[in-house]
């Protein structure tokens, strides 16, 4: 009897692995053999798995930047407690801006936190995106003045993190800044891939 083609076996294994519901189950399966690990760590497989099994809500980041973990009887409570113990929600690993103004949390998405530092009535802000668990950060360059000041100076700029797209790398991110002018609204987009702002 001929052996099945390797790609067919891989496809069957993928379908089996897609039925595993937790990251812990995937991690255990990936340690069984190199073939399982190769299949499970493939980006397209992980994307499909995340679509079928969205990550659990582990907690909330409060306005002051502190983390409120999920509590029992929530099934995510042990993982949430572990996250609270391991991550740095004081953001001490992010350098203080040159202005000396402390960081404030503006948005949280996909495990990343968008921080900003600005004085009252200041529209152009210092911004950073960080991962409190891995303690990595990216300081965003300022929005170029030639982009921000079109016909007039913006009244306010509201930054938000964009959700990760299906075709995007898990390490990349985008920040959207909505600039509010007297008579119009303009969106500026920062991409971690290009490290630049665009309209």
Language-model features, listed with the residues they occupy:
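N-terminal entry/capping and adjacent linker segments that precede and initiate structured domains
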Residues: 1-199
């Amino acid at each position: 009897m001929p052996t099945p083609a390797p790609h067919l076996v891989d496809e069957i294994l993928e379908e089996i692995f897609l039925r595993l519901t937790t990251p812990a189950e995937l991690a255990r399966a990936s340690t069984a053999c190199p073939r399982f690990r190769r299949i499970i760590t493939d980006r397209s497989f992980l994307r499909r798995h995340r679509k079928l099994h969205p990550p659990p809500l582990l907690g909330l980041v409060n306005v002051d930047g502190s983390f409120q973990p999920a509590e029992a009887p929530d099934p995510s409570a042990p993982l949430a407690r572990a996250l609270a113990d391991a991550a740095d929600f004081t953001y001490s690993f992010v350098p203080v801006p040159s202005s000396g103004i402390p960081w404030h949390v503006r948005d949280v998405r996909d495990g990343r936190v968008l921080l900003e530092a600005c004085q009252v009535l200041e529209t152009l802000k210092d911004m950073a995106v960080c991962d409190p668990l891995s303690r990595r950060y990216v300081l965003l360059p300022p929005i170029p003045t030639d982009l921000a000041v079109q016909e007039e100076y913006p009244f306010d700029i509201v930054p938000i993190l964009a959700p990760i797209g299906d075709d995007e790398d898990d390490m990349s991110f985008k920040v959207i800044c909505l600039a509010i002018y007297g008579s119009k609204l303009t969106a500026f987009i920062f991409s971690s891939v290009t490290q630049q702002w665009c309209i």
